[in-house]
Amino acid sequence: MKIMEIEKTNRMNALFEFYAALLTDKQMNYIELYYADDYSLAEIAEEFGVSRQAVYDNIKRTEKILEAYEMKLHMYSDYIVRSEIFDDILAKYPSDHYLRDKISILTSIDNRD
């Protein structure tokens, strides 16, 4: 897999984690099978009894939807910024248990389902 494809796959998987609840069941299934489970278009089409073109169109549409959600809500990009700030604080104050505890709480909030 090319680097650009890996980056896109990683981004789609991340956006899916944040916005899956906003998608239809079909959109969730197709995106998860395609990006997370590495199914081909043909495999997804066969599983759902539709054409490869139908799967392709749905995936492309859903990618645009996920990107639109991120453009409006910034959940993924904000998560990245928060994670970097937490890492910086922990690196600068490694022995501060109060900060460690608070960052641990904030991290657990970010990572809950």
From Swiss-Prot:
What is the species of this protein?
A: Streptococcus equi subsp. zooepidemicus (strain MGCS10565)
Q: Which HAMAP family match?
A: UPF0122
Tell me which family the UniProt entry assigns to this protein: Belongs to the UPF0122 family.
The job of this chain, per UniProt, is described as: Might take part in the signal recognition particle (SRP) pathway. This is inferred from the conservation of its genetic proximity to ftsY/ffh. May be a regulatory protein.
From the Swiss-Prot or TrEMBL record, give the protein name: UPF0122 protein Sez_1013
Concerning PANTHER family, the annotation shows: UPF0122 PROTEIN CBO2450/CLC_2298 (PTHR40083), UPF0122 PROTEIN YLXM (PTHR40083:SF1)
